[in-house]
C-alpha cells in the first residue's frame, strides 16, 4: 500500500539527539532550541518565535496571550482541525464559525464583518494546505474593529503572501501572533512539536513568561533579574531539547525537502491539468484542482481534488484503495460536530459542508517519487 504520508528523516536526527544527550541539557531551551528559533526568525522575519510541544500548544499560548475569556467571541473557520477552536474554548471564549470561500477551502473574508459583535476579540484565519488567506482584507477588518489576528499557519511553513503593497511576507508574520505545527504529517517534522510566532512587541515578554510556566525564568537566565518567580499564568509549553535536536536536523534540509515536495506537487498538477486525463473523467467524476490565488505561494503541503459530491469522492477513494493507494478526505465541519452543534447559532455554512464531502487528498511526501507513477496510473484507472 502506498501511504498517504510517510515521515521523512534526513539522517541527522539521531546524531543531534545524541549530541543533546551528551551536552546534559535535556529539558529544553538549550543549544538546539536556540538554533531552531534563531534560524526561523532570521529566515522568515518573525519578531520573536518560541518552540512549543505541539501546534495545539502554540494555539493555546496564543489564546492565553489574547486575553480572551468568558463573554468574549472568536471568529474561526469551521473547516479546520479541532485545535483551532479548542484553544479559545479552553479560555472560556465562545467560538463563532465562518464559512469557507466558494473557490477554495480558506476562510471567506467577505463573511467576517457581519459576524463581529461588541464581544468579538479575535479573528483566526487558517491557511489551508499552506495557501494564504486574503490577509490584507482580514487585517483591514481587524484594524477597523480593533481586533487581534492569530494566524493558524500549522500547514504553512515556508509559504508566503504577496500584499497589495507589493511586499512578500512569510505566513505567520502578518497577524499579531502565528502558530505552526511540526507534526509528522507536515513538511518539516519533529514527531510532534510546534512554534508560536510573536509579531507584536506588546506580547513578547508575556509570551516568554507563559512559555516558562508563568515564571520570568528567561529573564533570569539572560541576567536581567537576580532571581525568578511566579509572575503570571502559564504552562509547560517548552519542548524537550531532544525534540529541538530532531527539528534542527529537518531545518538544515528545509530547502531540499521543499524542492522535492514542490516537484511532486507539480507532477500532480501537470498530470491532472492534461486535457487527456480531464477528458477521461466523465460526468459526475469530473474534478476540480487546488486554487492558488495570485497573492499566495504554494509550499506543497498538500495536493487535493474536489469531486462533485460525496458519492463520487467515496467511489474514487475506494477504487484507489483497491489499487493499493491510500487517498483520504479531510476535516469534518466543526459547527456540526457532536460536541459543538448544539452551541452553534444555526447558520448554514454550505461551502464548509461541501469541502467536507468532496475534497480528497493524494499521497504527498518526500520519497514518493519512485511510486508517484503508480499513484497516477491508479488515478487514471479510477477515473476511467
Predicted segments, located by residue:
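N-terminal "arm"/small-domain region of PLP-dependent enzymes with the aminotransferase-like
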Residues: 1-27, 229-231, 363
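Structural detector of well-ordered beta-strand residues that form the stable sheet scaffold
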Residues: 50, 75, 96, 149-150, ...
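PLP-dependent aminotransferase-like
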Residues: 64-160
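Conserved active-site segment immediately N-terminal to the catalytic lysine
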Residues: 151-189, 219-220, 226-231
Amino acid at each position: 500500500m502506498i501511504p498517504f504520508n510517510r515521515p521523512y528523516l534526513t539522517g541527522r536526527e539521531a546524531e543531534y539527539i545524541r549530541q543533546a544527550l551528551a551536552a546534559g541539557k535535556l529539558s529544553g531551551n538549550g543549544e538546539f532550541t536556540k538554533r531552531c528559533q534563531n534560524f526561523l526568525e532570521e529566515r522568515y522575519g518573525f519578531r520573536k518565535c518560541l518552540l512549543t510541544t505541539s501546534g495545539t500548544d502554540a494555539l493555546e499560548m496564543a489564546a492565553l496571550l489574547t486575553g480572551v475569556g468568558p463573554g468574549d467571541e472568536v471568529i474561526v473557520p469551521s473547516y479546520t482541525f479541532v485545535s483551532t477552536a479548542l484553544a479559545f474554548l479552553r479560555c472560556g471564549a465562545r467560538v463563532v464559525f465562518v464559512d469557507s470561500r466558494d473557490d477554495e477551502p480558506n476562510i471567506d473574508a467577505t463573511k467576517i464583518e457581519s459576524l463581529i459583535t461588541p464581544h468579538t476579540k479575535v479573528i483566526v484565519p487558517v491557511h489551508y494546505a499552506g495557501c494564504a488567506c486574503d490577509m490584507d482584507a482580514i487585517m483591514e477588518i481587524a484594524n477597523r474593529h480593533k481586533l487581534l489576528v492569530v494566524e493558524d499557519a500549522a500547514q504553512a511553513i515556508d509559504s508566503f503572501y504577496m500584499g497589495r503593497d507589493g511586499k512578500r511576507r512569510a505566513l505567520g508574520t502578518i497577524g499579531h501572533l502565528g502558530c505552526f505545527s511540526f507534526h509528522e504529517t507536515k513538511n518539516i517534522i519533529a514527531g510532534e512539536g510546534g512554534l508560536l510566532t510573536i509579531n507584536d512587541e506588546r506580547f513578547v515578554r508575556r509570551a516568554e513568561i507563559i512559555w516558562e510556566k508563568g515564571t520570568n525564568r528567561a529573564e533570569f537566565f539572560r541576567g536581567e533579574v537576580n532571581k525568578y518567580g511566579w509572575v503570571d499564568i502559564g504552562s509547560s509549553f517548552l519542548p524537550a531539547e531532544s525534540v529541538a535536536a530532531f527539528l534542527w536536523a529537518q531545518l538544515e534540509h528545509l530547502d531540499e525537502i521543499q524542492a522535492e515536495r514542490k516537484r511532486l506537487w507539480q507532477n500532480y498538477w501537470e498530470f491532472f491539468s492534461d486535457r487527456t486525463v480531464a477528458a477521461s473523467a466523465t460526468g459526475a467524476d469530473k474534478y476540480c484542482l487546488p486554487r492558488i490565488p495570485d497573492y499566495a505561494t504554494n509550499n506543497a503541503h498538500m495536493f487535493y481534488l474536489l469531486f462533485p459530491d460525496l458519492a463520487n469522492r467515496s467511489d474514487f477513494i475506494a477504487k484507489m484503495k483497491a489499487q493499493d493507494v491510500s487517498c483520504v478526505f479531510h476535516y469534518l465541519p466543526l459547527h456540526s460536530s457532536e460536541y459543538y452543534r448544539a452551541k452553534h447559532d444555526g447558520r448554514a455554512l454550505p461551502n464548509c459542508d461541501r469541502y467536507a464531502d468532496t475534497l480528497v487528498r493524494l499521497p504527498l511526501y518526500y520519497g514518493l517519487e519512485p511510486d508517484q507513477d503508480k499513484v497516477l496510473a491508479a488515478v487514471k484507472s479510477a477515473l476511467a
